[in-house]
A protein has these predicted regions:
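Bacterial N-terminal signal peptides that target proteins for export
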Residues: 2-12
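Sec/Tat signal peptide C-region and signal peptidase I cleavage site
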Residues: 23-28
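Bacterial N-terminal signal peptides
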Residues: 12-22
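Active-site nucleophilic cysteine motif
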Residues: 161
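Cell wall/extracellular polymer interaction/catalysis modules
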Residues: 29-158, 170-181, 187, 196-264
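Short internal beta-strands
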Residues: 190-192
Length: 264
């Protein structure tokens, strides 16, 4: 028993060193700071037990979804073939109204499908810790949209970013940094105006952004179907999803179910 406890403590210490070290050659080279390292070392032990419930560990791939209307940021963790919802964080502050960001200085938070690479992390942020979501993406550029440095960060002040407070961003940042260090080349950040249910879409059907949101809903539905974030590209000013026929099958299944219901 004592030997087992010591072995567990050794493995935990090794994991903390592995995930929180600034310069292990086997890991991706990621900019760190004394703050990001101390935060990682502080949170790693508690994350071990929490992530184990999802058959996951610190450094496994993550996926983030943001919903403006309900002020929610979800962190999903991949412990097997699919992602599981790890935690939902309340967004302290974001800017503007429902709808996409269009230009620099409009004080509007973006919507769409983005991804974060290791060079998007900022451990020296003026807002505690932060990462750039990658706005503008190819879709935004196709519409001539401008803006820069759109972040998920600490504090509770936003001029286009998603401000989470310092304690919450510490957790989100540590999970993101560990995943990128552990060979996830990037993680996706999907930003929606609201949960893209049929009821919510109907409630907003008169919005000038409804066509844009219908395009976002395609990607939302794919993830809801099998808990795997779809690969996303932009063609002819639209988001296009590499579905492996997932979306087509889902539509067919829903149509079939609807016909059965009508017969009954």
């Amino acid at each position: 028993m004592i030997h087992s406890i010591k072995r567990h403590q050794f493995l935990l210490l090794f994991m903390i060193i592995l995930m929180c070290s600034p310069a292990l050659p086997a890991l991706a080279r990621i900019l760190t700071s004394p703050l990001s390292q101390s935060v990682c070392e502080k949170l790693a032990p508690s994350f071990e037990a929490e992530l184990a419930r999802f058959n996951a560990q610190l450094g496994d791939p993550i996926f983030i979804r943001i919903f403006k209307e309900s002020n929610e940021l979800e962190v999903w963790i991949k412990g097997g073939k699919q992602y599981s919802l790890f935690k939902t964080y309340e967004i302290c502050s974001y800017s503007g109204e429902l709808g996409p960001k269009q230009q620099e200085g409009d004080r509007q938070s973006p919507e769409g499908f983005y991804f974060v690479q290791s060079n998007h992390l900022n451990p020296f942020s003026s807002f505690h810790l932060s990462f750039n979501i990658g706005y503008p993406n190819n879709y935004d550029k196709a519409y001539g949209r401008t803006g820069s440095a759109l972040m998920v960060h600490g504090s509770c002040v936003s001029i286009g970013c998603f401000a989470m407070t310092d304690p919450k961003v510490e957790e989100i940042y540590t999970l993101a940094e560990a995943a990128l260090k552990n060979s996830q080349p990037f993680f996706r950040v999907h930003i929606f105006p609201f949960r893209m249910t049929a009821e919510n879409m109907a409630r907003h059907k008169h919005s000038k952004w409804i066509k844009f949101w219908e395009n976002l809903k395609e990607g939302y539905d794919l993830f809801e179907m099998d808990r795997v974030p779809p690969d996303t590209t932009v063609k002819q000013k639209k988001y296009v999803f590499d579905t492996d026929d997932r979306y087509t099958k889902a539509i067919s299944n829903r149509s079939y179910s609807a016909k059965i219901s009508q017969v009954r």
